[in-house]
Amino acid sequence: MRCLSKKHQKQGDEHGGEIPLPNPDEGTIICGVVRHLGGDYLIAKCLDGVDRKIRIPGKLRRKVWITEGDIILVGLWDFSSEKGEVVYKYGKNEVNKLVEKGVVPKEFIDALSELI
C-alpha cells in the first residue's frame, strides 16, 4: 500500500472521515468568512447572525489557507462571545454534507456569497 504525502491527502481524512460538528456545550459555532483584517484576524458572519472577530491560531495559519467565503468552525472565547478562534475549515464536499444533514441552511451559504 502506498503512503500519501500531506500534499496528496484529502482534508477530510485527518479526522477519519468524520466532519466536526458545532457543539454549543463546547462553545463552537459555524461561521462564514466575510473579510480578512490582517494580522491573522478576520471578520466572520456566524449562524446566529452575529459578526465576530476571529483569530487564526498558529497551528492552522501554516497549514490551512482561509479565504473569504469559506465556511469555518469557530470556538468562542469564554470571556467574550464577540471573539473566537478558528477550530476547523470545511472543504466544499464537507459543506455540501452539512447542508444535506441540515446543520447549515442553504440560505446561509447563498447570503454569504452575496456579502463578498
Swiss-Prot record:
Residues 1-25 are annotated as: Disordered. SMART domains: eIF1a (SM00652). One of its GO terms (molecular function) is RNA binding. Keywords: Initiation factor, Protein biosynthesis. It holds the Pfam family eIF-1a. Residues 17-91 form the S1-like domain. Gene3D superfamilies: Nucleic acid-binding proteins. Seems to be required for maximal rate of protein biosynthesis. Enhances ribosome dissociation into subunits and stabilizes the binding of the initiator Met-tRNA(I) to 40 S ribosomal subunits. Belongs to the eIF-1A family. NCBIfam families: PRK04012.1-1, PRK04012.1-3. This is Translation initiation factor 1A. It comes from Desulfurococcus amylolyticus (strain DSM 18924 / JCM 16383 / VKM B-2413 / 1221n).
